[in-house]
Regions:
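Glycine- and hydrophobic-rich flexible loops that cap the catalytic core of alpha/beta enzyme folds
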Residues: 2-287, 524-525, 547-556, 560-575
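Betabetaalpha-Me/HNH-type nuclease active-site subdomain
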Residues: 50, 54-77, 405-546, 569
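Secondary-structure capping and boundary motifs in well-ordered enzyme cores
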Residues: 61-62, 82-87, 192-197, 205-212, ...
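Flexible loop/turn segments at secondary-structure boundaries
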Residues: 78, 88-89, 209-213, 224, ...
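C-terminal, active-site-flanking charged/polar segments
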Residues: 90, 222-246, 252-256, 379-392, ...
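Short helix-capping/linker segments at secondary-structure and domain boundaries
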Residues: 101-105, 224-226, 290, 363-373, ...
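A cross-family structural signal marking well-folded subdomains
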Residues: 201, 230-233, 237-449
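Non-catalytic regulatory/linker segments of enzymes
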Residues: 206-209, 403, 519
Length: 576
């Protein structure tokens, strides 16, 4: 069982301890606190330490809990910070700004305060005197070009007009706030400093290893910036490329890759670089022939054999190529129109599995320029669309989809055609399931089906990936509620009564009779001014064809959608 050292400590107790020799490791992210976070911390501290603007009203036993600091002691005896580096860095800058004000003061309280702050910032000799050449914290953040500025500020207590880093901004912020505080409450100045040192509480958690520390971190509800798996991977790759004398080249490539991924995967719930590594992981899994549907975690997969997969010259090239591919998908460039249409539809898939399949396909089949052969790629996209859509109805849940998809990934890297031969659907059975399925708006497959259907229309134009689309009830719910002319109100949630519609138009159209909806679809305002026209070609055609949409129309349209979908599956050899 892992051993942990957990002991609540004040800032002074933790920072001044001779055992406290902190290291911000190379896999951590650069300092990121901005003025909002700094102001919130400062205001909280002042409110706590000087209650109701009265230093004498402070309870000396009061405590202000700032959060945990998760570390482990590395092979060099330094405490590597896994969680809490943002707040720890901020406290160091705050204390250094305070120290600069006390540096030349000679009254007893100021001398005592200065002495305590010195023990927090610098290592001391056996007599307790600070060695100002040895800070209590060091930084090795690989992608942080400003780390030297951070260490310089701690050493000198000064910034210049040339210093533009977050560290300099934080130091200057605290210096300014301290000056204002001294002007307003000159007699309270030492009190505030001592209460920061002796009444702000941290919870240092020292684990016996990096892995244990990371596991602890993942369970904590952190106020700071979460450490991503990709940060750990960056550390391993940084060491590998440093040993090959390619450190600076690696850092530059990593920064560019990180910037690109932040833009590409802006909608992702996970860290953008984690998203890229996840998509790459499925390629490596396929090459290893892994069919097991119990997918291990991202870090668990890559840490095997001491991160051997990451210690390879080709890794950065593969990641860059994969990011460039998804950038082209996102920007809708570099593909034929028919492939862009398929990719747009897949963007509304009921789950993310398609992105893993397509990533494996790209990495295995790309040419030297990162291009894919048009015809086989289009056929592949067509088939996985039909299969993923059908499986979401036939056997809902992404976990179930792993069973047929993981073997398909292995087929890709073995140069075999993906056919899903063992998982083809019975037409009649699937037809009955689709008719019985409740296509409520809360189910992702509902919008998936509607987008697929819209793009079966050859006149449907390609849409921007960032366009916000809602689900429109063509026969309005309010109309059914007040008119009572639907014999079966469940038809309201039928695929035959739904279509995608731009959010801005949907807000206006939601409660109208179809005659009024027609005008909104076509952009007719009634006052002669033209408004936004829907980009849903089918709705335009419906609006131009009739001034009514009835129960019969719902049923006819539902049958048409379902029959067309089944024909689509048949054309892609997905039916028995």
């Amino acid at each position: 069982m892992s051993k942990l050292n957990i002991d609540q400590k004040t800032v002074l107790d933790l920072f001044s301890s001779k055992k406290s020799d902190f290291l911000i490791p190379d896999y951590q992210r650069p300092y990121a606190w901005e003025e909002d976070e700094l102001a919130a911390l400062w205001d909280d501290i002042v409110t706590f330490a000087i209650p109701h603007d009265n230093a004498e009203g402070f309870d000396k036993d009061a405590e202000y809990f700032l959060g945990p600091i998760v570390t482990f002691r590395n092979s060099e005896g330094k405490l590597e910070i896994i969680d809490g580096q943002q707040r720890l860095t901020t406290l160091m800058l705050l204390l250094r700004a305070y120290y600069s004000r006390f540096e030349n003061m000679q009254d007893p309280k100021s001398i005592a305060t200065r002495g305590d702050i010195e023990k927090c910032l610098w290592k001391t000799d056996e007599f307790g005197s600070p060695d100002k050449d040895q800070l209590k914290i060091d930084s090795e953040v690989a992608s942080d070009g400003d780390k030297k500025e951070f260490l310089s500020i701690l050493e000198t207590g000064e910034t210049t007009s040339q210093n533009k880093s977050r560290y300099a901004q934080a130091f200057n912020f605290f210096a300014e706030r301290i000056n204002k505080f001294i002007d307003a409450y000159p007699s309270f100045t030492p009190h505030l400093a001592m209460r920061i040192l002796k009444n702000i509480i941290l919870l240092p958690i020292e684990a016996e290893s990096q892995k244990t520390a990371l596991q602890i971190f993942s369970t904590l509800n952190d106020r700071g910036l979460p450490l991503a798996d990709a940060d750990i991977f960056k550390s391993q790759m940084y060491k590998y490329f440093s040993d090959k004398q390619q450190k600076d080249v690696f850092i530059d490539r990593w920064k560019k890759l990180e910037t690109r991924c932040t833009d590409i995967f802006r909608k992702s719930r996970s860290n953008p670089m984690d998203e890229l590594f996840t998509r790459y992981m499925y390629y490596e899994r396929a090459k290893q022939g892994i069919r097991d549907t119990t997918t291990e975690g991202l870090r668990d997969f890559f840490e095997k054999d001491s991160y051997s997969l990451l210690k390879d010259d080709r890794i950065m090239g593969d990641l860059e190529a994969l990011a460039n591919f998804w950038n082209r998908v996102d920007s809708q460039e570099g593909f034929s129109n028919r492939i862009l249409r398929r990719l747009f539809v897949l963007g509304y898939a009921p789950n993310r599995m398609w992105t893993f399949l397509v990533s494996v396909y790209f990495l295995h089949n790309r040419d030297k320029e990162g291009q894919l052969a048009e015809v086989p790629f289009y056929d592949f996209l067509e088939r996985i669309t039909g299969f993923i859509w059908s499986y979401a109805i036939f056997r809902p849940g992404v976990n179930a989809l792993r069973t047929p998809v993981y073997p398909a990934m292995i087929e890709i890297v073995n140069n075999q055609e993906v056919t899903f031969e063992d998982y083809r659907f019975n037409r009649e059975s699937l037809q009955n399931q689709i008719h019985a399925y409740q296509f409520t708006n809360g189910r992702p497959i509902t919008k998936s089906m509607l987008i697929w259907w819209a793009f079966q229309n050859p006149n449907q134009q390609l849409l921007d990936n960032d366009l916000k689309l809602d689900i429109e009830h063509i026969y309005a719910k309010k109309r059914a509620q007040f008119s009572g002319d639907l014999s079966d109100t469940s038809l309201l949630e039928s695929l035959g009564n739904k279509a995608f519609l731009e959010k801005r138009i949907n807000v206006r159209a939601s409660d109208y009779q179809f005659a009024a909806k027609r005008a909104l679809y076509r952009g007719d305002s009634g006052d002669g001014k033209k408004r936004e026209v829907t980009k849903n070609q089918e709705l335009i055609e419906l609006a131009n064809k009739s001034d009514e949409f009835t129960e019969t129309d719902i049923k006819i349209r539902e049958d048409k959608i379902i029959d067309s979908f089944l024909d689509y599956l048949a054309s892609n050899r997905l039916l028995k």
